[in-house]
């Protein structure tokens, strides 16, 4: 039986640029492991960053900019949208009401440096 989500992997063109975007501009916790791979931590889950030039054979069809995911925040999404715009991040949509895994959420959508669609949502 499937019990939850452990991690996702993003194939990226420039790991340093991606780490800077998520860590410095969005506040994600970032760390490098012993193999030199970067991880973004989100509570009990994580996002692994994999340079597209060094993808393992099992992930050879993974392309930068094709992911679409939602992370949760406790921050007011109207304030978040304003903060993103002030940081030079183009807000594509939102705040807008959606249905999340556990109920109503208010979401803000934007792209990361590789073009992945990032949704940050706050439960209503």
What are these regions (language model features)?
Residues 1-17, 67-69, 123-124:
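N-terminal beta-strand motif that seeds the catalytic metal site of vicinal oxygen chelate
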Residues 3, 35, 103-105:
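Loop/turn position at the start of each blade in beta-propeller repeats
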Residues 11-53:
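Core segments of cupin and vicinal oxygen chelate
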Residues 17-18, 76-81:
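Short, conserved charged micro-motifs
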Residues 38, 67, 104-108:
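Short beta-strand micro-motifs in enzyme catalytic cores
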Residues 54-60:
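Short, charge-rich, low-complexity interaction segments located
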Residues 82-124:
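Vicinal oxygen chelate
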